[in-house]
């Protein structure tokens, strides 16, 4: 399979000479991505909003690569102020809570003082049946459904559990 280059349209990609993402076989390498909204070339001054925008930008790049956030296997976070990382946890959990990729966080300066976080991901595309792509929400719902016991099994456990305890300890009168 040929290498595929993906662009977000960010002016930085052309100026510096890099791709938002590179697809090589089943692997997708997404460059360090900041919280810029590439349509407006604006950035929030709030780290939580920047984190959300970073992950939206990454999700869009993965989609162009025929991958999704569910395919992410490694994430690197870079923050100029490491003490702000905890503020990002709810947003990160929203995107990666079920995926649980390998992660590393670094404290380092970024290219612009307005940038409060930069996120880089590596994804490995999962095998999918030809012509069928499962939306993330449906896939998560299916996994959750598989983990839940059938209602009849729950009722049987509730009914049988006390009987087992009584049989082991005392006889019924």
Where are these regions (language model features)?
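N-terminal presequence-like segments and the immediate start of the first folded domain
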Residues: 1-56, 60-65, 70, 79-173
């Amino acid at each position: 399979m040929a290498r595929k280059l993906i662009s977000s349209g960010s002016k930085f990609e052309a100026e510096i000479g890099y791709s938002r993402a590179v697809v090589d076989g089943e692997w997708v390498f997404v460059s360090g991505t900041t919280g810029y909204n590439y349509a407006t070339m604006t950035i929030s001054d709030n780290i939580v909003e920047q984190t959300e925008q970073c992950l939206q930008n990454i999700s869009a790049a993965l989609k162009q690569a025929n991958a999704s956030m569910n395919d992410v296997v490694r994430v690197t976070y870079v923050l100029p102020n490491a003490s702000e990382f905890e503020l990002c946890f709810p947003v990160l959990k929203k995107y990666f809570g079920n995926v649980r990729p390998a992660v590393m966080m670094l404290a380092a300066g970024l290219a612009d003082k307005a940038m409060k976080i930069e996120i880089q991901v590596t994804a490995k595309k999962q095998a999918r049946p030809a012509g069928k792509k499962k939306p993330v929400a449906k896939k998560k719902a299916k996994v959750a459904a598989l983990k839940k016991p059938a209602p009849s099994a729950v009722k049987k456990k509730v009914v049988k559990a006390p009987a087992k305890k009584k049989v082991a300890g005392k006889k019924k009168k």
